[in-house]
Each structure stands twice: as structure tokens, then as C-alpha cells.
Amino acid sequence: MAETLSSLQDLKAATAVPTEEAPVYAQKLDAFGRAYATGKRKDAVARVWIKPGSGKVTVNGRPLDVYFARPVLRMILQQPLGVAKRVDQYDLMVTVAGGGLSGQAGAVRHGLAKALVNYEPELRSALKKEGFLTRDSRTVERKKYGKKKARRSFQFSKR
């Protein structure tokens, strides 16, 4: 019996697949000690710079509550900081262009999550699990000829 156990353990050790460790990501900072990333959503493109601070957020040179007046949009923007438990620990400087306010808020969220990973690589797994590092590829479907919109047909009359 002892022989069988030892041979089984030898077999298990021989066939064991070595576990691969997760790759170690390096911190990426610019000359001013800031982390930079771009985020996209629909037609909006956001460029985000973060640095340690008191939680001050400027979007296109304006305060956050002025640019994104609706609380829902501000909540979308703050989600990566909440998941990472870093609320009011970073100052954000954002430039965003294109699309509407909802797409812009989503683009800033995507860029902020990527910038957080560039500053603190250990946050990558938590942010990836929540889906903040994934580009939302849903865009407006193009209009087709012979149709009123992308899928809506013209009104049909039998007689």
C-alpha cells in the first residue's frame, strides 16, 4: 500500500503543471510624476492625468460638478476610484472631446481606470474584474439605404 501511495505521489509530481505567475506590470509615470491614459466610449475620447492629491477633478479646465451637472454622470466617473478604494486620494486632470455627456463620462471612466493601473499596477485585477479596463465597443449602427434609420423601415401601406 505504501508503495502505491509513493508511486502515485511521484506520478502526480511528474505530471503537475507548473503554475504561471501573473505578469508584473511596471509603474508608468511622466516627468511630472503623473500617470496618463486615454479612454474611449462611443464617439468620445478622454485623456486622463492623475497624481496624488486631495481629490480635485477638472474636466476641460472646469470643475467636475460644473462640467458633469447630472449626479449619475459624476457617479459613473468616480466608479474606478470607489472600487480601488482611492476616493479623494488623486487629483484628476481630464480633457475630453466628441460624443455626448454620457459617452464622455464613460470615456473618462475608462481612461481613469487605465491611469490608475499605470500608477498602481496592483489594482489591475480588481479593476479588470469590474470591467473598467475593457473598451465598450458598442457604437451607433449605421443607417442603411432603403430604410428610414438603421433598422426602421418606411411606413408600409398595403393599399
Curated annotation (Swiss-Prot):
The keyword Ribonucleoprotein applies. One of its GO terms (cellular component) is cytosolic small ribosomal subunit. One of its GO terms (molecular function) is structural constituent of ribosome. One of its GO terms (biological process) is translation. Disulfide bonds: none annotated. The keyword Nucleotidyltransferase does not apply. Belongs to the universal ribosomal protein uS9 family. NCBIfam families: PRK00132.1. This is Small ribosomal subunit protein uS9. The gene is rpsI.
